Structures are given as structure tokens and as C-alpha cells.
Amino acid sequence: KLSEEDAAAIPYREGQTVKFLNQVGDTLTYQLVRDEIYPYNGDQYINAINGVDVMHPAPHSTECYARTVILICEEWDAKRLCFTARPEKEFSFHSDDLDLNICLLPNGPYTINGIDYEHVHHEILYSHYTGELLYDWYYNEEFGLLYFKKGDFSLTRIP
């Protein structure tokens, strides 16, 4: 079963909206459209991040329980944000063409958009071939996604 602590690794709740600045300074408003705890296995995860109704697997195929939250924005160029938490704070972040799996172990305080945040997980990856930035993101269990950049697209949380 998914513990309350593991489920709370995603701070977003039903009906909540979250505002971000995009790469050109426009404000994007994301709305929580899905919040579901379900028996988890790989197929259910793929269905959940793609917005498909999660069908409950046979008991022998259930690996554990997970919570998936999806936020969308009506702007034409905005990426869908999907967060999944599994036991032991194993955490996934999916945004259209990007799927990241991490353990939510905070690695330091950071200042983002002029605000100091404690217990922030920061993940950054560069291409081994070109040295180009592939993605950069900051996440906090209390506030959620703080900053995300992939290619020309970026989001910065507005408090």
C-alpha cells in the first residue's frame, strides 16, 4: 500500500491551479485534472501518464500502489505535467516527451525566482555526445515543481 508520506510527495490536490512563467515570461496556469491512487505495474503507469483510464490489474501483476497526478494547461505550446509517486518515495516526472525516474532525496536548499526553498531535489543532465543541456529541474515536496527546462521550453513556479 502507498503510505500517506509517499503519496504526499506530490503536493497538488484536486481542483488546484498552479501558475508558472514560461521561457518568454508569459504566465501559464495549470489545472489539476487527475489524481488517482491505483494498483501499480508498468502497464498501469504507461496508461496513467497517457491519460488513459487505469484498469486494475490482476492481483498477481500488482507490484505496489502508486499515486499519479496530471496537470494541464490550455495554452497551445504548454507541456502536460504528470507526477507519479510509488512506495519509498520512488518518483517519476513525465512531460510529453520526457520521462524521469528519481528517488526523492533532497540535495540542498536553492533560490528559485528570488525565493529560498529548503529540501529541494535538483536533477540536471547534459548530452554525453554534444554537451548540450537535455533537462534541468528542481522539485520540492511542499511546493511541487519549482523549475523545469528542456530545450527551448521552461517553466518557473510563481508563488
Model feature map: region roles:
Residues 1-159:
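Conserved functional acidic sites
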